[in-house]
Amino acid sequence: MTLTEETLRFIREHRKDNVRNLALQAHKYPTVDVPAAIIQIVGRQIAEEKIPAWAAREGILYPTHLSMEQCSSEVTANYKVKIVSDTGYGSRKTFTDLTGGFGIDCAFLSACFQQSAYVERQETLCTIAAHNFSLLNLKQVMVCHEDSIRYLQMMEPVDWIFIDPARRDGHGGKTIAISECEPDVSALENLLLEKASHVLVKLSPMLDLTLALHDLKHVQAAHVVSVNNECKELLLVLERGKELVPEEIPIHCINLTASQKVQKLLFIRQQEKEHTCPYTPTLKTYLYEPNASILKAGAFRSVSSIYNVEKLHPNSHLYTSDEYIPDFPGRKFRITDSSSLNKKELKKLIGTEKKANLTVRNFPASVAELRKRLKLAEGGDIYLFATTLADEKKLLIACKQP
């Protein structure tokens, strides 16, 4: 990818501008490759939020919008580094990223190794990666323009392989199984572990975690990773020569927050089955909502047991306690009032409020429907939870942050 000095100057001068307006004004800049410039401007604008360290580096090249949307963030890439850096996982000399993409994960992970290989079948992405790795002085990374499966078959053994299969349903259908992704890691598992003692698999949070743990035979740990309470990635560590039944696999529920605090919960499915979880139709002083990673992983009884909180209903996934628990891995609220769906009670609950933050958990109406009925805009200091209690009573719970 070659950009003229004039196009590069245009990118620098307009990097914070609205790209739609720039596209409409393209005729004003006959000596500038405006379409190419817009790709770079959009890429950098996304990177400012997603990969700030790269956005701050002058000269980084960016791929198309789709590749930028699909790539890992700086925060999740750093978390992968922590996984691979675990001293219990043995040697870290050689590494191969079989699905290179924009190269974020490869760039961050390669810092842990003496030699690394970036493999990507799209030539444009290889060109971008080679430029950026050189700019970032990542001399230990070799860029390979090749199909991942073909490269895997012919490569020399390494210590670690990273692979990020893409969901391949082109019709908007819901992809939930590893076998529906490309490449199919379940079909390649034996070959992957012939070539590496450890494999780190990144999966979409849309996939079924339980199904993935059954489909792969050598999973040693699963990491469900959220950023600011939005589930972003499922990460599976495969280890050669070791097998665990799915019920014994450690599952790390991680929420990386804007305040740099990390919410963690570790559980295994066997313990989850054995834990008791008390249900209550009575609201206590505080309301607790587990973070997105815990909800995705299904650690509902474990949360109750570890933090000594009672659940409102088997399907509501909200908990209550008279004790304030500052390190609870999720959102924490002080309950101020509650109401049935009776008009008088609702009027008393809402009062003169014009807006509130509304959440629905196990309730026969959507957020949009309730917002319209209650005539409330989004925002403000009030948090409303529409849910069902253990006695099947439908309730609106008003809360504030403690």
Q: What do these predicted ranges mean?
A:
Residues M1-P402:
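SAM-dependent transferase fold signal centered on methyltransferase-like domains
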